[in-house]
């Protein structure tokens, strides 16, 4: 894998800077404190794509079953970053991140390990992450179960900044097939795992306002994570019970077209920062603290 040009990401909103200082103090005496790092580096190429502004609609995917399965096609190559506002309205984010020296096992372990303590979650994005407890933590930690049995059907309750907005979200992890991904195509694509989910506002967990797809696959030298986020209203979301209420709920919470486009941009930046940062330390963290997740 050829070397990438990584650059420091240095702008964070004032609430995020204040959160960083609180997180830094909280993690200080933890055995993993050295992995709490000030500098966050991201691929310059990903930054430049986001700087080009919203994507053309013909280059985006919708959350329809047909479109999400394009991610599994042999000749489909995801762009490194990008965002757009889809008709609906719906925020759209796409990304593809490389994790040098990382394996699928390491990535699975991270999703088992980090919810146990808020301080662990802050390692992932020190300026944005507050807490991410798991509803069924005992099941998540049950080593007699496979990774999929521990994660799917489980809910993480994330509190995090996206831009300067503090969001409280329920992330309901699902079997890929439950979200519409074709089982045969998934197998043929040799995907090593999925941490895909429906997302809702914490105050209204019965209304999914977002579909989030994360597919990871080992390659020579590391692992790729291909991601898509859709937040808002779209006819194809009707396959998920409660999603028909998403448009009115988001509007009630101040998410009109302009706010959703801003959210798409901020989510694109957030995704770029958090996953590239995780990639920078996960292999070392796993070697020190890791145990098999499946």
From Swiss-Prot:
Enzyme class, first EC level, given as a word: hydrolase
One Pfam entry name: DAPG_hydrolase
EC number per UniProt: 3.7.1.24
Residues the entry annotates as binding Zn(2+): 129, 160, 270, 274
Cofactor dependency: Zn(2+)
Keywords assigned: Hydrolase, Metal-binding, Zinc
GO MF annotations in UniProt: hydrolase activity; metal ion binding
pH dependence, entry free text: Optimum pH is about 6.0.
Cystine pairs: none
Catalytic activity: 2,4-diacetylphloroglucinol + H2O = 2-acetylphloroglucinol + acetate
Top-level taxonomic group: Bacteria
Notes on activation and inhibition: Specifically and significantly activated by CoCl(2). Competitively inhibited by MAPG, but not by 2-hydroxy- and 4-hydroxyacetophenone.
Record note on quaternary structure: Homodimer.
Family that this chain belongs to: Belongs to the DAPG/phloretin hydrolase family.
Protein's job: Hydrolase that specifically degrades the potent antimicrobial compound 2,4-diacetylphloroglucinol (DAPG) to equimolar amounts of mildly toxic monoacetylphloroglucinol (MAPG) and acetate.
Protein's name in the database: 2,4-diacetylphloroglucinol hydrolase
């Amino acid at each position: 894998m050829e070397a990438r040009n990584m650059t420091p990401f240095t702008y964070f909103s004032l609430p995020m800077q204040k959160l960083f200082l609180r997180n830094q103090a909280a993690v200080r005496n933890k055995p993993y404190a050295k992995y709490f790092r000030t500098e966050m580096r991201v691929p310059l190429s990903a930054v430049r794509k986001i700087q080009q502004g919203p994507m053309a609609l013909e280059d985006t995917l919708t959350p329809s079953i047909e479109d999400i399965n394009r991610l599994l096609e042999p000749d489909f190559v995801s762009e490194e970053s990008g965002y757009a506002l889809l008709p609906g309205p719906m925020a759209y984010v796409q990304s593809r991140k490389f994790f040098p020296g990382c394996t699928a096992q390491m990535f699975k372990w991270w999703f088992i390990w980090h919810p146990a303590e808020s301080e662990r979650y802050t390692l992932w994005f020190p300026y944005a992450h507050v807490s991410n407890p798991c509803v069924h933590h005992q099941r998540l930690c049950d080593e007699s179960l496979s990774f999929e049995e521990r994660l799917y059907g489980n809910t993480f309750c994330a509190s995090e900044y996206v831009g300067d907005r503090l969001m409280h979200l329920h992330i309901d992890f699902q079997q890929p097939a439950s979200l519409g991904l074709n089982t045969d195509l998934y197998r043929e694509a040799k995907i090593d795992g999925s941490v895909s989910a429906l997302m809702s506002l914490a105050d209204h967990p019965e209304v999914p306002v977002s579909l989030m797809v994360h597919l990871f696959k080992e390659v020579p030298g590391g692992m790729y994570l291909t991601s898509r986020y859709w937040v808002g209203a779209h006819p194809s979301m009707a396959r998920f019970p409660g999603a028909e209420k998403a448009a009115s709920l988001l509007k009630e919470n101040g998410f009109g077209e302009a706010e959703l486009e801003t959210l798409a941009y901020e989510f694109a930046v957030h995704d770029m920062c958090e996953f590239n940062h995780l990639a920078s330390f996960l292999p070392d963290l796993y070697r020190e603290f890791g145990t098999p997740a499946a």
